[in-house]
Amino acid sequence: EELDQPGEWCLDSVDGVLYFWPPVLSEAEGPEPIEQGEVAVPVLDCLISFETKGARGASWITLSGFKLTETTTGDNMHREGNEGYGAMSPLAGQGRTYCGEALHMRGAEHCRVEGNHIYAVGGNAVYIEDYNTRNIIRDNEISEAGAIGICLIGTNYACPIRHYPFYNKVVDNHIHHCGVFNKYVAGVFLGLCDGNTIAHNLIEHMPHHGINLGNSQYGRNIIEYNEIRNTCLETSDNGAINAWGEDPWGHVTRDAERSG
């Protein structure tokens, strides 16, 4: 009885039957005929991973011109602690590596991700974790991600080794309609990272932040020339550009265009 309008679905877990009422294409066309539609069941927790293991480094790789879509949520959860709250990471203690990313980067250097369309993934669209440096994420369209659009996050600042992203660039991307499943998210999320540049991005239609600067001992991230609009649509205590934590110092924010 709860299935009463187009776009809704219901699972009968006892009989193993999924009921789905197709969404309305337009007032004139009505609901999409289900026999003409396409049903996709995600089975991968991550589509592509740039990762350094031992002496084999992930460097000088270009990922361009791809459509990346349909991952699971990977049983993702919020990271613990202020430095990562709002970022999704694998379920602790379960041996999982990924949580629904289209692209996961760990230990990558001098890589380029440009001109891709990333949409309808279960978790973060692009997850840049731990040591990553001098990578460029440019000119991608990212939409309908289950969590964050692009996440740069460190894992440990009490260590002489740089276990955090630094000197990366996120530029000229269009990020919109993310946070489908997790609402405490941002178009671009930074936590425990240093010297990254977030510039010339269009970020819109987000349930929470446009850009979020989490707890950081380092600072020195540059946020500039971004257009941010229609954010904070489903949650409170947030902002188009949000910064908080124990040491939110040294960041530069300038020339942000705001509309709504």
Residue spans of the language-model regions?
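Active-site-proximal structural scaffolding
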Residues: 96, 106, 119, 130-133, ...
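Active-site neighborhood of glycoside hydrolase catalytic domains
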Residues: 190-240, 244-260
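Extracellular polysaccharide-degrading/modifying enzymes targeting complex plant/algal/animal polysaccharides
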Residues: 1-107, 112-115, 159
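Surface-exposed acidic, glycine/proline-enriched linker/cap segments
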Residues: 84-100, 159-178, 183-185, 245-260
